From Swiss-Prot:
UniProt keyword annotation of 4Fe-4S present: no
Domain FAS1 residue range list: 99-232, 236-367, 370-494, 498-630
Post-translational modification S-cysteinyl cysteine, affected residues: C62
Signal peptide interval: 1-23
Subcellular location: Golgi apparatus; Secreted; Secreted, Extracellular space, Extracellular matrix
Region (Disordered): 811-838
Subunit comment: Homodimer. Interacts with BMP1 and fibronectin.
Post-translational events: Gamma-carboxylation is controversial. Gamma-carboxyglutamated; gamma-carboxyglutamate residues are formed by vitamin K dependent carboxylation; these residues may be required for binding to calcium. According to a more recent report in human, does not contain vitamin K-dependent gamma-carboxyglutamate residues.
Statement: the UniProt record of this protein carries the keyword Magnesium: no
Biased composition annotated in UniProt, kind: Basic residues: 826-838
PROSITE patterns per the UniProt record, alphabetical: EMI (PS51041), FAS1 (PS50213)
Gene: Postn
Protein name as catalogued: Periostin
Amino acid sequence: MVPLLPLYALLLLFLCDINPANANSYYDKVLAHSRIRGRDQGPNVCALQQILGTKKKYFSSCKNWYQGAICGKKTTVLYECCPGYMRMEGMKGCPAVMPIDHVYGTLGIVGATTTQHYSDVSKLREEIEGKGSYTYFAPSNEAWENLDSDIRRGLENNVNVELLNALHSHMVNKRMLTKDLKHGMVIPSMYNNLGLFINHYPNGVVTVNCARVIHGNQIATNGVVHVIDRVLTQIGTSIQDFLEAEDDLSSFRAAAITSDLLESLGRDGHFTLFAPTNEAFEKLPRGVLERIMGDKVASEALMKYHILNTLQCSEAITGGAVFETMEGNTIEIGCEGDSISINGIKMVNKKDIVTKNGVIHLIDEVLIPDSAKQVIELAGKQQTTFTDLVAQLGLASSLKPDGEYTLLAPVNNAFSDDTLSMDQRLLKLILQNHILKVKVGLSDLYNGQILETIGGKQLRVFVYRTAICIENSCMVRGSKQGRNGAIHIFREIIQPAEKSLHDKLRQDKRFSIFLSLLEAADLKDLLTQPGDWTLFAPTNDAFKGMTSEERELLIGDKNALQNIILYHLTPGVYIGKGFEPGVTNILKTTQGSKIYLKGVNETLLVNELKSKESDIMTTNGVIHVVDKLLYPADIPVGNDQLLELLNKLIKYIQIKFVRGSTFKEIPMTVYTTKIITKVVEPKIKVIQGSLQPIIKTEGPAMTKIQIEGDPDFRLIKEGETVTEVIHGEPVIKKYTKIIDGVPVEITEKQTREERIITGPEIKYTRISTGGGETGETLQKFLQKEVSKVTKFIEGGDGHLFEDEEIKRLLQGDTPAKKIPANKRVQGPRRRSREGRSQ
């Protein structure tokens, strides 16, 4: 008896090794979960889920157990003995181990009696009862019943050859447990070494040539039996062979040839092909199909979008899953009962056509990837209002197939009734603000980026921790890139900024008190110059009850006033909807203290105060409206009267009082813009006329260059003003100017001057003079250079023609009278008595 102990120990070790709970394969992990769910029913009981109305059963995964459904269908829970165990009369659960027999006997133990019978009549029985080690993928009785009757009859009529070969094609010449069946493995069968494609999926499903293992790991003395849900058919063709032989796939075959992909489907691999039928192609608009087929890049993208680089059998799909296609984008494959859906649409009409390099599913819809679509075709159901308006107002036709564009598409509910009912010309301008001249993908956007629309407007990009915004509107998920452009989805209609912070406040009477205090604090320039600011602007309600004496008190302490006002201003542009909802965002104000912002239920809270209106865009920042005066809680007040005033206006916090304390003086930093002016010496060209020559002077040309980059900061003391000074050294050389045929010598003069630029931008002019019968020549010249016409007055300054003057010149009016060099005359010009034009 002693020698039996080591043998018994080895047997226990073997059984422990194959115990699903101790294995690491997906199948065994799901089996272990089913065992846990069934343990209340007794030892070695597994919980299975059966889809209602079918005979399909699955070991319970965690996900399916809690959902109570598989492929969207409700399931009922069954409790059965786990593989390798059996019940005993009068005892709970499955306390007994199944007897171990040879492979032939095990077929009967697992209930695969039809396979057992066919193994007997085909003379396979002797082989699987004898010596050896086999893996038998045995079709269930139901699988044989579902086999095509003609095929089954043919096997039964030739049991010694056809049936025997068919059964051998279900066998492998070694024992392989589910943990040995690796995903993507190809195992040679016992019939001509034809490959068996093994797939072992994360949800625990194991397939062989897309047949699902429904009862695995039935150990035999000379191998193992895995019961499968269908009969395996012999395969010897590739996906390419199948496409070339199927007449119903001729359109798809043509697309494969056009894109040079047909031959690649004949190579070794583990592909999944969703092949659209000819009927599917007939559903496409003819123009769309012709455009794609005429574009090799688009047709290649179309083909690759139908191919996966992994073998995906239908039986492995128990819920929605996302897969990457060869094209690079993803598709979602799901199931609804026995139907397979792609991107949420049931379209698979024939599944699991197994070939030697993959599997084919026939579909009745053509899958068009974004990369093969025109930019306007990228819009989804939530952007139909935008795309409909773009088409109705004639903008869609301007999006040329060979151009590149970016659509900034607001969602449907962003368009109010008032917007939709406005004048179509104005509505067209609004839509133009949502179309960019170039293709800009999501990954191309960065903070501070300037984008130009087809309407000529410039839009700013703001990138935050959890949001990307363009002007006042922030993106939602759904950005796509197509053949000639990209689309990004926005919550609201984008409103380009037109006015500065100061101009916005000035045109809104709600801010008149705050604006007056801001100007009294000498802070007006801060809101007029270029920059990026966020202003929390208090309305007049914030100062309700403040008397004129109290206002004078506040203005009288300039440091205090500046501290209070600058606490409402923070560097950077912060859009309300750009903040991560529900969390506090801490910003440092220009005054130096912190301000606390939070987005709650589409409302911006500023120091826990609700903003009455947010995201008012300006050219140098954004305004958020508050109806309370903001004050930094960490700054004490040392003046009794000021404290009384602040307590009168601010009731939501307790202001500290420290007698004698004063407000700090805040050094004001301003942006300075570098301007370089280049002066080019004038060139004189004499145009001969019939009576009077025309002097055409080009120059002096002045080029204004604005250098953008990091701002320069310098300290500006109180009372000091900032002036932009341009240094130049124009050189005027000696030349002769002919006026009415009389030569006038102008001596060479060289000077150095400083020009203080306080007015509008420098305009470039062209200098000319003439008159008499040379009007036709002058008129032609003016028509070409109508925006650059200047009349040169002898001894005086150049004069820029206004629009009305230009019109009169074009109509033949004569120039004005002579004007002294040291005097500029306003009003209409007249001819002098001498007849000399100026």
